[in-house]
Amino acid sequence: MAIIIGSDEAGKRLKEVIKSYLLDNKYDVVDVTEGQEVDFVDATLAVAKDVQSQEGNLGIVIDAFGAGSFMVATKIKGMIAAEVSDERSGYMTRGHNNSRMITMGSEIVGDTLAKNVVKGFVEGKYDGGRHQIRVDMLNKMC
């Protein structure tokens, strides 16, 4: 499992905080926007492509408010994503929605909160069962 991360210019600093946190915790991290100045649309598409390339990969995209990247991610066939700004949502979107991507806003979420959101997201496990009905409904929409 790899954690694929990316950001636009507004999210670059927070992306580096998250990347350091993940690397410190021994996660395999791929930064698809390292050394690049990209729009949130391109950052999100690059993260989603790598997430979908291998089962088990997860993605994190940071822009100014999280909403733009979220809208892009949800347009991608087969991608379930969540815009999150609290720890519980980061964890629960894995457990109940089987989200493979989260988006966050660097102007909404501070460093410590971002690390806690990411911790919940990457440590969360999909519960399946009754939640699979909704996941199937989401996938059928694509």
Curated annotation (Swiss-Prot):
Nucleus as UniProt keyword? no
Q: Name one GO molecular function term.
A: galactose-6-phosphate isomerase activity
Per the UniProt entry, the Enzyme Commission number(s) are 5.3.1.26
Q: In which pathway does it act?
A: Carbohydrate metabolism; D-galactose 6-phosphate degradation; D-tagatose 6-phosphate from D-galactose 6-phosphate: step 1/1
Q: Does the keyword RNA-binding apply?
A: no
Q: What class of enzyme is it?
A: isomerase
Mind listing the UniProt keywords for this protein, alphabetically? Isomerase, Lactose metabolism
Q: What's the superkingdom here?
A: Bacteria
- Write out the GO biological process terms: D-allose catabolic process; galactose catabolic process; lactose catabolic process via tagatose-6-phosphate; pentose-phosphate shunt, non-oxidative branch
Q: Which reaction does it catalyse?
A: aldehydo-D-galactose 6-phosphate = keto-D-tagatose 6-phosphate
Spell out the subunit comment: Heteromultimeric protein consisting of LacA and LacB.
Its family remark reads: Belongs to the LacAB/RpiB family.
Its name, as the record gives it, is: Galactose-6-phosphate isomerase subunit LacA
This chain's source organism reads: Staphylococcus aureus (strain NCTC 8325 / PS 47)
Q: Taxonomy-wise, where does this protein's organism fall, top ranks first?
A: Bacteria, Bacillati, Bacillota, Bacilli, Bacillales
